[in-house]
Amino acid sequence: MNLIKELYNYREMIISLVKKDLRGRYKGSALGFLWTFINPLFQLIIYTLVFSTIMRMGVDKFYMFLFVALVPWIFFSACLQQGATCIMDNKEMVKKIYFPRLVLPLSFVTSCFVNMLLSFVVIFAVIIVTGFGINPVALLFLPLVMIIEYALALGISLITSACTVYVRDLQHILSIIGLGWMYLTPVVYPSSMVPDKYRTLFNLNPMTPIITAYRDILYYKHI
């Protein structure tokens, strides 16, 4: 409770750091904040071409199947890899002033979360424009899934950011882990493709039920 109270006392600092991170993401670029929407769209196009056209995944409306999973994965991947360095990236501030070190990973993950929410605007725009449709009842569970993913991403960032202070190579190791983790998660393929003998191990992946939940709500339109 004391930690929560202390974080509440530093809420203005957290909000300020979130705003600073959001403004600084694409500072100096010609398109600026538009990259928030362009980046996931370009990734969607590339993955759709590779897995739907070249590898012939054979999933109906693969672009939507992929998009509703890719955006949450981009958020998690950023927290996994970049969140690890959030304390080291602010080491001068850490040396000069006192504040709960939890503020740094918390503000970084929150910034990434806001960025994901903005990307979801594109998802809903695509759903509306293409007439894909939404199940309003299933949609009520979307905030819960987002909160669970946020909590997981924050927990991992808290651990990795603390460890990276002592083990600098961890950030590079996490980049490799992140790439492998994506392909062990049903982001670009349906979970039904996983052989039964590996399914128990597959389900131990904490991102599997989260990505599956996003897809159930927005693609399959059921709970």
Regions found by a protein language model. Give the residues of each.
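Hydrophobic transmembrane alpha-helices and immediately adjacent juxtamembrane helices
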Residues: 1-223
